[in-house]
Amino acid sequence: MGSGFSSLLPCFNQGHRNRRRHSSAANPSHSDLIDSFREPLDETLGHSYCYVPSSSNRFISPFPSDRFVSPTASFRLSPPHEPGRIRGSGSSEQLHTGFRAISGASVSANTSNSKTVLQLEDIYDDATESSFGGGVRRSVVNANGFEGTSSFSALPLQPGPDRSGLFMSGPIERGATSGPLDPPAGEISRSNSAGVHFSAPLGGVYSKKRRKKKKKSLSWHPIFGGEKKQRPWVLPVSNFVVGAKKENIVRPDVEAMAASSGENDLQWALGKAGEDRVQLAVFEKQGWLFAGIYDGFNGPDAPEFLMANLYRAVHSELQGLFWELEEEDDNPTDISTRELEQQGEFEDHVNEMASSSCPATEKEEEEMGKRLTSSLEVVEVKERKRLWELLAEAQAEDALDLSGSDRFAFSVDDAIGAGNAVSVGSKRWLLLSKLKQGLSKQGISGRKLFPWKSGVEENETEEVDNVGVEEGVDKRRKRRKAGTVDHELVLKAMSNGLEATEQAFLEMTDKVLETNPELALMGSCLLVALMRDDDVYIMNIGDSRALVAQYQVEETGESVETAERVEERRNDLDRDDGNKEPLVVDSSDSTVNNEAPLPQTKLVALQLTTDHSTSIEDEVTRIKNEHPDDNHCIVNDRVKGRLKVTRAFGAGFLKQPKLNDALLEMFRNEYIGTDPYISCTPSLRHYRLTENDQFMVLSSDGLYQYLSNVEVVSLAMEKFPDGDPAQHVIQELLVRAAKKAGMDFHELLDIPQGDRRKYHDDCTVLVIALGGSRIWKSSGKYL
């Protein structure tokens, strides 16, 4: 999670670990550091990633991206912050968020397979009827991987070279340092919004958008450290997906995802490990977080579909609860009106000059140009002007001669006309008119000259209501919904989004049933946590869990006994004994102190979710009551002998008879009746955070194969706030799995994917630091 770079340097020298334990080792040379990145990193094991909100107090210590652009290259120097990035205490945009940082880690055991159905273009749109134009229809990468915006930092998990059982992030041993690495000195942040370095692959339209913004950032931050570009500590974007072909990498529709939020402050991340998927969406300005863990089974299509569509469906349902559209001002300001009027007058003059059959003299044209440019200077316009406007504002003598060699022409006729013109001014006005008319033609249909800047597609049609809408894209900004929130409506919105998403998935399964009947076998458990301020909304299906680590008062027998003795002593002092002098009590006597001793506190794990599996007697009873005619609905502690979970997303072969009948006989069940054997009805819960809550743990069921709730919280606390808690929990999981199998830690990791599923399941862990806790040092804070 990005510890200070000065504390990471000793960990590079892997050949002298024993010597470093007894004496401080010298810092390795720069060439040695570069050589440590020569070997490509294996991404099949998993990833470690973190997120730190850009709204955190940056005066405590610099962010990694800012720390390496200081003039003195000092890693501890707090750089001058960008204007507008720091919100004052009285700013209306400064919001209180219930979380401080996110630590995540994923480890895979199953083989990562490609999706069965690759094209889902119009299915989700028909099911959800979303006003945002459908869901994010594509996935993240072709294999185990992680992708996110600049506020997220990630690197693949690697075992230590000395077979010590400790993780590494790349060439750095993760047992000594936690979290992803920081960029090197002189490396300029490529983020234009969050100010945190980027260490995951980024492609598609979003990558082009960020590269265009890079020029602006270069103008503000000079490069220090020589002309030669230093190799970044994190892997380059092109080499992040090791061994993957570029054409096989499928990127998420980031523009559509950003459009659903309506703001540029959306920070997102998508990751996969085996059949597990993780999705994070953070709205920094609106102050809420969406975190989803999707634990798939029998194939990747169900969790992929959830990762592509569930967030957008829930976000659409939350309109009016968490966010709302800003109404456009119907009465523009006087300045804007004057600008439009002056531009209209200027265009009229240009048209008159271009269509005039009697060319004016150079002196008259110069005077006219002065009058036009002086009229435009009445109001200072900060907006960028068109090319023909800038050229027309220049003086005739100082302006660029557009016809010096008669080469500047839009056509052959223009060149001939310019050559026959009487004066240089006439040539210039003729060409400016052509340029202006050319730009005007682009705006006839109401679309801009560069449609890719605004995401306008050619196949979009203009809607009837044009208020704030251009080419089918709603230009109104989305803002945080003020006022109190009805928690029941929020939970209902989450449930509606899930219902619409599953309906779309089952419809897709039915459409491709003849060609891909195996899609009916695929399903997924899911866990979604929605946080807004101090309110947490949990939705789960299956056996994934959400825990809250909190301190509670531990009432021991000793503390109760001490309180009773104090009360008895006070009663004795209050008795009036006339035969004796009043008793003088020393205030230093702790036994009669008015204040009782502070109670002892203990860390407990509060489970916010409900398990849906055959291990829960209520779930088994429910299924048997729903299928009284089927005596074999639960076989071998599984639903129809197939699934351990009693509720799941997808898995249509246990929900619809026609989907079950399409399967091969070896996979087909004896379906009695038409009622589904498993449901997609989620468990919903609202929880209000308190000052005693330290962090929240979200994880798939693979974690609880070897760890209990209390052990998970205790392990996370060992590396909290000074380490990487999520990765520490994952490491302990693998250690216990290896110990149970009677093998070494590295022997377990040497087992290829697929075969390793015999010893442990795919596992994804998210540790969310809450507002009442300290943020861990490895996330870029020096406390």
From Swiss-Prot:
Q: What is known of its domains?
A: The conserved PP2C phosphatase domain (257-736) is interrupted by an insertion of approximately 200 amino acids.
UniProt xrefs under SUPFAM superfamilies? PP2C-like (SSF81606)
What EC class does the entry list? hydrolase
Residue ranges constituting the PPM-type phosphatase domain according to the UniProt record: 260-770
Compositionally biased, Basic and acidic residues: which spans? 562-580
Q: What is the lineage of its organism?
A: Eukaryota, Viridiplantae, Streptophyta, Embryophyta, Tracheophyta
User: What keywords does the record list, in alphabetical order?
Assistant: Developmental protein, Hydrolase, Magnesium, Manganese, Metal-binding, Nucleus, Phosphoprotein, Protein phosphatase
UniProt-recorded name of the protein? Protein phosphatase 2C 29
Family to which this protein belongs: Belongs to the PP2C family.
Where is this chain primarily localised? Answer: nucleus
* In-chain residues carrying the UniProt-annotated modification Phosphoserine: 199
Q: What does this protein do?
A: Involved in the regulation of pedicel length and of CLAVATA pathways controlling stem cell identity at shoot and flower meristems.
The note on the cofactor says:
Binds 2 magnesium or manganese ions per subunit.
Q: Which cysteines are joined by disulfide bonds?
A: none
One GO cellular component term, please give it: plasma membrane
- Cofactor annotation: Mg(2+); Mn(2+)
What phenotype has been reported when the gene encoding this protein is knocked out?
Answer: Loss-of-function mutant pll1-1 (T-DNA insertion) shows suppression of clavata mutant phenotypes. Redundant with POL. Pol and pll1 double mutant inis seedling lethal.
Locate the residues binding Mn(2+) 2.
295, 701, 761
What is any one GO biological process for this UniProt entry? unidimensional cell growth
Query: Segment Disordered: which positions?
Result: 151-194, 555-595
